[in-house]
Amino acid sequence: MTGSSIILRDGSLVVVRDYIDSDLDKIKDFVDSLSDATIQGRFMQVTPKEAVLRALIKNEWKTIIALRNDKIIAHGALYKGNEGFAEIGIIVSDNFQSMGLGTAMLGLLAEEAVRSGVKEIRSFVSPENYKMISALKSMGFAVESEAKPGAVMVRFSPSSLPEAIRNFDNRDSLSAINAVKFFLEPKSIAVIGASSDRTSIGGQLFFNLLESNFNGQIFPVNPNHEFVQGIRAYKSIRDIEYPVDVAFIVVPADVAIKVAEECGEKGVKGLVIITSGFSEIGDVGKKRQEQLSRICTKYGMRVIGPNCMGVVNNSDRVRLNGQFSPFKSIKGRISFLSQSGALGIAVFDITTRLGLGLSSFVSVGNKEDISGNDLIQYWENDEETDVILLYLESFGNPVKFSRIARRITKKKPIIAVKSGRYKAGFRATQSHTGALLATSDITVDALFKQSGIIRTDTLDEMFDVAVLLANQPVPKGNRVAILTNAGGAGILAADACEAHGLEVPDLKESTKEELRKILPDIASVKNPIDMTAGVQAEMYEKSLEILGRDDSIDSIIVIFILPVVLDPNDVAKSILRGVKKFNNSKTVVSVFMATKGMTEILREDGIRVPSFPFPEDAAIALARATEYGKWKYSPPKEIRKRESVDLEKVKAIISGAMRDGREWLTYDECSTILGIYNIPTVKTATFRDPKEAELKTAGWQGKVALKAYGPKIVHKSDVGAVELNVPVSKIKDSADAMLSGLRSRGFQVDYMVAQEMVPEGIEMIAGSSSDPLFGPLVVGGMGGKLVELLKDVSTRLAPIDMEDAAEMISELKTADVLRGYRGAKVADEEAYKEVLVNVSRLVSENPEILELDLNPVIVLEKGLGCKAVDFRIRVGSQGFKAPPFVAKSILNV
């Protein structure tokens, strides 16, 4: 059985799952524990507990329970009514009220109702139970209320679910922050497996904690010694007389399970499990980790690891060095998540050499529980973190990660390296869309792009971008001035800028005139500005002051190549004085004597100019930061409420095909579904026998397109399965000839279609293919016969909005074709964007759709819309199943 892990407001976990008959004894205990006031709030009157029990165990459409320590602490039910409405009822144990549990269960049930096509949700609430009404409103549901005798009936439409998801993510942030605080801001720590031997992991970790002067209590646990490194030791966690917030576990894996149980009994809030020997070693370790997970979930404990390096918080409020490396990090304003423990050791050394200090560091290991989703929400509000770095090897809940990251990257940059170049794992695909997306890293790119995350290919690039954003303002545009004392280096910088999407514009005439007045006659004041090798150090300051006043540039690359006559310290001071004069209004980076990082001579009085060893490195880092700036400074997106659609009819079509063992929907089924989602198609007649063609097209005028469909017919033009401009009067003869030709070559033809000819337009593609982890991926781009050859497409994870669709189109190399290229008519780009958004909604609401292919979509002249003239939909039970939006993850319970 599966369930959902829910984070309460205090950061602890509970499990929510379906109620089953064997839970009867648990539900009896739950009812017995309820106060009269709680019962009255749920049932509008004081009700005998026998009647409460009967009501709660009644077999309803959907009944869920929340558990902590194997005891039921909340109950929720969805009651299906007539005419498309459903009723929700929730009751929470007195001890767990006002912790966000009722709100989470409400979200779970509301999402289930939405998936089932419910058009209105109702709940009868006691007038005194204002918390229920407040919860609905706070989640963003458009709530209406109506007074009834002794009760208030509240109702809301699931169409406001997108806003509810966003609001719940904001509420969920507090829970995630409180959970991470267990680990990064503990008041007391136990180290189980602490040792006096500093060559052991437990010994070095305990030494690091002591040496960091941790601002709290530290308790070593070792059954074999009275003292560890001079501190009184305890034989067991249970022997410690004081509360323990976090326990570091550094014992063999088979012992760690027993220790975790003892920590739960002790009331420990979180475990940092350094120990290896879990899922990373195979089946035996996976079973061990599953056992560990059950124990921690039972007690509501949170976990970092197992198989991790530990955690660091360099804040003066905490002073926590809870990791086993002999290296120490310097204090700074960057926070780092590493999924690799070994990499973490190197990070301390690299960041110190680059002059990049760390605010905090977390090695998540196998990510049993605490993951990037939790940590980035903590760092979002951490006043000591300016830049977030992520080294990821896998994703747990990428859909939720994307939603959270979209919010955070508007405030702080997130820079990520995703190792392994994830292979999307699409099943054997048979459509144009599937072929474009199969076996690629495109899912990760799409996730990062639409979340505002800066993706770098290497750790070296990550630190280049980090040193820039940690020390300079985010660029407000892509216009770059290059100031150099060596012409060749300036040309290299200019080439690299333009190769990575930056513009090196001609400077304003007034700027060039000012530069001519101060620079040698042989200097070039074009952009790049070559001051020449013989220039004096003070020319850097004067030139930067002039460039700082030029509003036609956004960033400056300053290059210094060491000549014999200049002292680098003098040049550095000159650069700092120049930068100081324009007060962070522009982003400045330097290429300073092949120096990398944040060198001491380029920092003074709060002004810090990062240095790169080569012009290309500076340009690439600046380009990444500029792309992020475009995201950061873009206006917030409005969430449009979705119009209701006949979801039940769509589900009926899909389930009917699956029941019949069919993967591909028929043309008529596809056409019906597309119509329900307002995706325009052409006038069509379907037939199985050419004799039917004349009957089905009786009364049609002009010419038609004739097409054949079958399981192996994908690229119709390649096999003679499409003929255009067929006179209606000759449709039977043409259909006969096409059918005979296909069958003679071994193709099975299931049916044929005749379509009205669409006026001339631009052939585009719109489609989706489902990934088992990331969900449906939406694709848009140039379509037609050459789609797989050109591969000029853009992708996003569903769902998308109109702004996302606009960005997708802008990313196409051939975007200008839609915009009146070389005097052609401007196409209806808005209509095409609507198609992409509606495709996104269709596949999001129907995860059984494995592939959807609209190719081509003919985009007509502006104002005339567009038409999908060929389409295919493949369905299956193995489609993407996203965790509920209120859940941290799906659990096996």
Segments the model singles out, each with a brief description of its role:
Residues 1-175, 179-180:
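Long, contiguous binding/interaction regions
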Residues 159-893:
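Catalytic-core regions of core metabolic enzymes
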